[in-house]
């Protein structure tokens, strides 16, 4: 399978895999902070040029330790339920929290309203 991302891995280290990473025995994520920041800046530039709002899709990337890299450049987060909405509100305070869900639980909705700035409903039946 061909890689879609043509950038060299480990751009922060000049494409060289640091020795301390070469013998890692367990599966793990190694994130390139420089690449995350560059991508966040790019998203911010697109938002500024177009007037759109860029949101962090937490379903795809909920590594909240990395939210500070995105926070200056994004309008907020996107959540698919109560717990992601709370995560977005807690980890990006002052930013927007958008919620989209196929079905909302009645017993969670009041709490969800505490975190959500925007809620998307699939149909009038959800209201």
Would you name each region that the model predicts?
Residues 36-39, 43:
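Alpha-helical packing segments of well-folded alpha/beta enzyme cores
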Residues 36, 126-127:
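Adenylate-forming
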Residues 12-16, 42, 48-62:
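N-terminal glycine-rich anion-binding loops that anchor highly charged ligand groups
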